[in-house]
Amino acid sequence: IKGTPRFAKVEDELMVLQHHAPIYETLEGSKSVDPDIAWLGEKLRAWQVTTVYPVAMQLLKPGVSADDRKLLCRLIYSYLVRRALCGLPAKNLNKVFQSIAQVFATGPTTPMALKEFFAARPGTSSKFPSDAEFTLGILSQPAYTLAQGNRIKDVLWELELASRSKFAEAGPMPGNLWVEHVLPDSWNADWPFDDGEIIQRFSGDPRATNR
C-alpha cells in the first residue's frame, strides 16, 4: 500500500541493509563475496546498467543454488547484450527489472522463473530476443554504434574468450584495449565496384551479398 512503511522497526531495515551491503560492494567491484556476482557486476559496470541491482541482490538469498545463480547471471547479461545489438529500446528496462525482482521476491529465484517471465512478455519493450533475432541483429545492425565504447569492447572480448580452446591461458581483459572501426560507412565514391554500379548492402539484391 502506498505510503505504508516497509519495515515495522528501524532495526529491521538496518538488518536488511547490512545483509545486502556485501552484495552491493561486490557488484561495484570493491569486494567479492561470490565469483558470479562479481562477474555480473563487472559486466553491468561496462554496460552502465544499475537497474539490474534489485534483481542481483536476490541471487544470493538462501535456496538459490550456485548453478542457478551462475546461469541467472549469464541470462541477465545475455538479455542486455541481445537487446542492445538488436537495436531494441532500453528506456523500459528499469520497469522490467523491477518486475523481475518482484517475481523473485514472491516466488522461486530460478532460471525457469526468469524464462516464464519473458515468455509472458513478447513485446518490444521487454522481450528477450531469440537466437534467430539476435543473429539477424548482428548481421543487419551497426553494432559499433548500438553498443559504443566499453560495451562493444566487452562484446568483442567475450567473442575472443569463446574462440579460445580450453588450453588457452586464462586472464582478465587488458585495460588498454580499444576498438577502431576502420571500415567507412559510405565508401562507394572512393572505392567503386569494377562495373561502376552501386548496390546497397541490405537491399536484398544477391549481387550485394556476392560482393
Placement of each model-derived feature along the sequence:
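A cross-family structural signal marking well-folded subdomains
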Residues: 1-158
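Generic alpha-helix signal with a bias toward terminal, lower-confidence helices
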Residues: 59, 88, 92, 168, ...
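Alpha-helix capping/termination and helix-coil
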Residues: 60, 80, 163, 183-191
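Short cysteine-rich loop/turn motifs with clustered Cys
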Residues: 154-176
